[in-house]
Amino acid sequence: MTKYRLLILLLLFFAISFSWAKEALALTNQLTEASTQFTRIDKTFISQGDKLKAWLYLPSGVLTPPVVIMAHGFGGQRWMRLPAYAERFAQMGMAVFVFDYRGFNDSEGEPRNYVNPARHLEDWDAAIAYVKTLNTVDAKRMALWGTSFSGGHVIVEAAKYPEISAVVAQVPFTDGISTAWNNYILDDPMFALKGTYHGVADILVSLFTKHRHNVRIAGRPGEAFAMMSKPDSMQGVLKLTGISDEKDFESTNFCPGNIVFTLTFYRPISRANKVACPALIIGAEKDTLFPPKGPKKMADKMKKATYISMPMGHFDPYVGEPFQKLVKIMGDFLKTNLRVSSAK
């Protein structure tokens, strides 16, 4: 009887081991297949005298593919979920150039984490100029991709460069005046007062010293002042970083306080009617950071805009089901307008 039990246990052991081995082999094959669909190359380019860091994704087996240029939103860095988009687009046959702004991550530039629309737009200009020099991509088929704050940047840039073939703006920042009034002054007057204090403090500190007065980028309601302090802000940002403990995020959770003023008077929507290329604008119906109707208003000002809205919050597009749905919609839009071969 003991021998039979031992035999049964051995058979079960081998069956389970075979099942695990089969699953591991399948996963290995999937990873190998994905890794052979594109390569990622470290790149460095210059903006206003500083070295900016970037990744260039190149699809395998495609000579001079079209290219998508992307950068992150407010206080974001390129490793925060942007590779998820870049990899999917590369698998669809497009090159992707993902860069960090001056002062962020491993890019040079002072002050650190300086969120400034004019400065960011200079970096976009430099990225576009650099990508045009690459002989590994077809810069005549170029798209711009932005999200949140950079969703506004790509609209401004597309209006500036008529040769751009397509633009994608995900949950974009559209109008600083409307955002400040509707989402902050009316909703939380104390936020406006505290923001004014920190903005003035930063200006004074920077005038008389070499330092900056920093504020937190993300926080929770009732905590120390943060530029993004809605109920879903901190958890939303942590989703992008993959960091579970927000204490581990605090070392990069800051930016100079004068953004309170520069953000208020930044209005990408004022340039929307100058965008000539096809545009995909994606809105979030439950957005608490920006007015939910802003993306639709911006799309209505464009000549060739497609507008999509989803019942989601500002930070939801980056993961889970919203990401899976939207990345396919974006990919199909880009493939069509960048004339990607259907053979890929």
Describe the residue ranges of each PLM region.
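Catalytic nucleophile-loop/oxyanion-hole region of alpha/beta-hydrolase
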Residues: 78, 104-139, 320-321, 326
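Conserved alpha/beta-hydrolase
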Residues: 88-108
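Alpha/beta-hydrolase-fold enzymes
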Residues: 156-243
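Short beta-strand/loop motif that positions the catalytic acidic residue
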Residues: 275, 281-283
